[in-house]
């Protein structure tokens, strides 16, 4: 797969969308899928949510240099220990020797024993003070690993949801791929900037493959919890790890719930 290079995109005051797209060929055409990371800049501290894919290591480092504009990176907040979410931790910790890994870090000492002294466990409900804004750690109500964490930025009202709220556009994924995909030219677009809003079928296609457990679980209770999260944490944007940043929060919530229900009913698997 080739890497599609894109510059970091500011999506809100103090929030930058980093990472890149991987490309593959499926069903006779090129398709891309996002592997996202997000930088939140406060008055005193900065935090990076997820690390991007190791294939994007040099890109993420360059994007950080640009977005930080000479400031240090203080906190790394991987949402869970999978390669697209934590794979660049060694490179980032080397580049930023004073940065700390903060969040649900219960098994990171096993993956990165040489960096165990830089782990700072924080539980859901705790906050990271960045100066003028806080990054609030939250339970992940849609997840593929038990120790997944979501986060909410109080400064701009951005909810970072890891593998939640992923969706595809226009085309099914590359053969044997599980990631939400889109066509070239649609990288780094907000969901509202896409030619068409995501459909239930597009959301269901990615959901049923990337989160296999959704085929067997009625998520109505989880979405009730998500609505309570949104009530308590006013949200203007949702930043998934895979897929476009969502600027129609209410619409995507309805679409995603319908997609999960379709997968559970066996009607959203693209088969």
Model-derived features: where do they sit?
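Conserved beta-strand hairpin/beta-sheet module of binuclear metal-dependent hydrolase folds
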Residues: 6-64, 149-153, 157-161
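Metallo-beta-lactamase
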Residues: 10, 96-148, 217, 221-224
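Helix-coil boundary/capping segments in enzymes
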Residues: 33-35, 61-69, 210-221
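Short, surface-exposed connector motifs at secondary-structure boundaries
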Residues: 43-46, 69-74, 234-235
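Active-site neighborhood of phospho(di)ester-bond hydrolases with catalytic His/Asp-centered motifs
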Residues: 49-51, 73-81, 100-105, 159-163, ...
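Active-site metal-binding motif and surrounding structural segment of the metallo-beta-lactamase
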Residues: 55-101
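Active-site environment of divalent metal-dependent phosphoester hydrolases
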Residues: 81-87, 108-111, 126, 144-146, ...
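Cap/insert and terminal regions of metallo-dependent hydrolase folds
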Residues: 168-271
């Amino acid at each position: 797969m080739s890497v599609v290079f894109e510059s970091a995109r500011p999506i809100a005051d103090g929030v930058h969308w980093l990472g890149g797209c991987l490309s593959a060929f499926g069903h006779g055409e090129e398709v891309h899928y996002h592997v996202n990371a997000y930088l939140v800049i406060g008055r005193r501290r900065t935090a990076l949510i997820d690390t991007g894919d190791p294939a994007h290591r040099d890109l993420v480092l360059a994007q950080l240099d640009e977005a930080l504009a000479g400031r240090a990176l203080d906190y790394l907040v991987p949402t869970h220990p999978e390669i697209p979410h934590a794979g660049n931790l060694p490179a980032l910790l080397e580049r930023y020797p004073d940065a700390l890994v903060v969040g649900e870090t219960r098994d990171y000492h096993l993956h990165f024993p040489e960096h165990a002294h830089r782990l700072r466990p924080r539980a859901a409900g705790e906050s990271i003070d960045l100066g003028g804004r806080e990054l609030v750690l939250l339970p992940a109500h849609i997840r593929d690993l038990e120790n997944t964490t979501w986060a909410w930025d109080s400064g701009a009202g951005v909810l970072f949801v890891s593998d939640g709220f992923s969706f595809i556009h226009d085309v099914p994924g590359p053969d044997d791929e599980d990631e939400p995909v889109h066509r070239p030219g649609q990288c780094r677009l907000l969901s509202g900037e896409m030619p068409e809003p995501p459909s239930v079928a597009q959301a269901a296609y990615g959901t049923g493959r990337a989160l296999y457990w959704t085929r067997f679980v009625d998520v109505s209770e989880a979405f009730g919890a998500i609505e309570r999260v949104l009530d308590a944490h006013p949200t203007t944007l949702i930043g998934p790890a895979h897929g476009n940043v969502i600027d129609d929060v209410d619409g995507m919530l309805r679409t995603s719930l319908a997609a999960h229900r379709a997968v559970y009913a066996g009607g959203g698997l693209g088969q």
